[in-house]
A protein has these predicted regions:
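N-terminal charged segments
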Residues: 1-2, 18, 27-30
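Active-site acidic/histidine proton-transfer and metal-coordination neighborhood
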Residues: 70-110
Length: 110
């Protein structure tokens, strides 16, 4: 098993502990919902910092709720781009080398 390729999501309450124990990476998932980058950031940031203690590598999961980077509406695309730029800034802050971004494609709409 190549531990370098395994990342546990912080959605799981014990992900940090297990990642430290087995040498896995951590996927920061607290910002999947964009409001955690805004009004809740002061509360969420120290939690993320604590989870990353003793973790050598991480990925950052960008927000995806109600974001459509492939939208027909250019204002919707602009919002997605703004959120993704902010996610990339946060990823750098936390030392993450990769960012997970969903395309926003919905077959029921397009």
């Amino acid at each position: 098993m190549n531990r370098e390729k395994i990342y546990l999501s912080t959605i799981a309450p014990d992900a940090s502990r297990i990642a430290r124990e087995y040498g896995f990476g951590l996927e920061i998932a607290e910002y999947c919902t964009a409001w955690n980058m805004d009004e809740k950031f002061a509360d969420v940031d120290p939690v993320v910092q604590k989870k990353l203690e003793g973790i050598s590598r991480s990925t950052f999961h960008a927000p995806y709720n109600e974001l459509f980077p492939c939208a027909i509406d250019k204002k919707a695309r602009a919002l997605a781009a703004e959120r993704y730029r902010h996610a990339i800034e946060l990823a750098k802050r936390y030392g993450s080398k990769k960012v997970v971004i969903h395309a926003g494609y919905n077959p029921w709409i397009y």
